[in-house]
A protein has these predicted regions:
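Walker A/P-loop
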Residues: 14
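ATP-dependent NMP and nucleoside kinases share a basic, alpha-helical "lid"
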Residues: 98-106, 112-145
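ATP-dependent small-molecule kinase phosphotransfer cores
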Residues: 36-109
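Short beta-strand-centered segment that lines the nucleotide-binding/catalytic pocket of NTP-utilizing
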Residues: 26-40
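ATP-binding Walker
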Residues: 11
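Small-molecule kinase domains that catalyze NTP-dependent phosphoryl transfer to phosphate-bearing small molecules
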Residues: 99, 106, 127-128, 148, ...
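Hydrophobic anchor at the beta1->P-loop junction of P-loop NTPases
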Residues: 3-5
Length: 200
């Protein structure tokens, strides 16, 4: 079984991933794959062709080796749907290809494989998984966690949450919800309940 795990900023999906790993389940992190893919020479060339040299890291100009600044790229495409669509068309095919390769490899040894995907529903990846699981937290909890963790202003956090798909919308699309409005012990119980229900 391949399970897609998603959530929003500050809902605790990475914490759930860590706890699942501690229990011995393999978890593929699509964010890690995307960091690897963005370093592929052909991807760098395609991104520069579309978004210009301003998305490159400055410190690599001496060595002549090009690399993309994720921060600069984010600022370039943020709030521009056309640019986001172009970025996705460049990044998603190699990311999905690598994800499938890792799933295939892990399925040889493991009955269940989890894949952590922040934008699972936004980029319509549901068909890649046997089931989808949402790590859910209410908006107040999301804001509190991100303020504590990232040192951003509340306005910035609100803006990020508003830019993401509504959590209640994600609830409707998910096969299972892991509630995470409480502490670590409560989350452990939620994960245990989920594992028991699935019999994995």
């Amino acid at each position: 079984m391949v399970i897609g795990l998603t959530g929003g900023i500050g809902t605790g999906k990475s914490t759930v991933s860590r706890k699942l790993r501690e229990k011995g389940y393999p978890v593929i992190d699509l964010d890690i794959i995307s960091r690897e893919v963005i370093a592929y020479p052909e991807v760098i060339d395609e991104l520069v062709r579309n978004f210009g040299n301003e998305i490159l890291e400055e410190q690599n100009e001496i060595s002549g080796k090009k690399s993309i600044s994720r921060n600069k790229l984010r600022q370039t495409v943020f709030k521009d749907e056309k640019k986001v669509a172009v970025l996705n068309s460049i990044m998603h095919p190699p990311i999905i290809e690598e994800m499938r390769r890792q799933i295939k490899e892990l399925r040889q040894k493991h009955k269940t494989v989890f894949v952590e995907v922040q934008l699972l529903f936004e980029v319509k990846l549901e068909k890649e998984f046997d089931m989808t699981v949402l790590v859910y937290a209410n908006r107040k909890t999301q804001i509190e966690r991100v303020l504590k963790r990232d040192g951003r202003s509340e306005g910035e956090v609100q803006e990020i949450i508003n830019a993401q798909m509504n959590m209640d919308e994600k609830r409707k699309l998910s096969n299972y919800i892991i509630e995470n409005n409480g502490n670590s012990e409560m989350l452990d119980l939620e994960i245990e309940k989920f594992i028991k229900k699935l019999g994995i």
